[in-house]
Amino acid sequence: MITAYKTIQNQLEKVSWDPSLKGVWLKLVNPTPEEILQLATTAQIPEYFFRFAVDEDDCPRIILGKKCILAIIHVPISHGDYRYGTSPLSIILTPDLTITISDESIQVIPDSTEGSRVSLDTTKRTQFFFQILYHADTVFLQSIRYM
């Protein structure tokens, strides 16, 4: 499933994605092969970036492409009753887009409906990338407290 967000007047808003839009965050949760192929073609991202992104056994790393960067991290996932595991979260940065890819909905990524206290600006992709990493770290530290 592909969901697009864009910062409009300092608010993170859900928008319908158009390849001509710049400064958009595309949130992919359990993407289908068709969605991956469509996005790889329209956003001009190497298809192998998406294969690495959805490989659950892949290790965290950063891959540099010609016009994009892929960062793969592991984030904590709650399985209830104080049981935690990790799940890969892949972040692709292009000049116009920030794309996050995960197998399941991850709380590390702020949802526009949650009224996040942090001001998220999707047009500032480097800052947005570091905010995603910060959220992952915060959730990880909260998870450790319950172990």
Feature-to-residue mapping (PLM):
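Peripheral, non-transmembrane regulatory/ligand-interaction domains of membrane transport proteins
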Residues: M1-M147
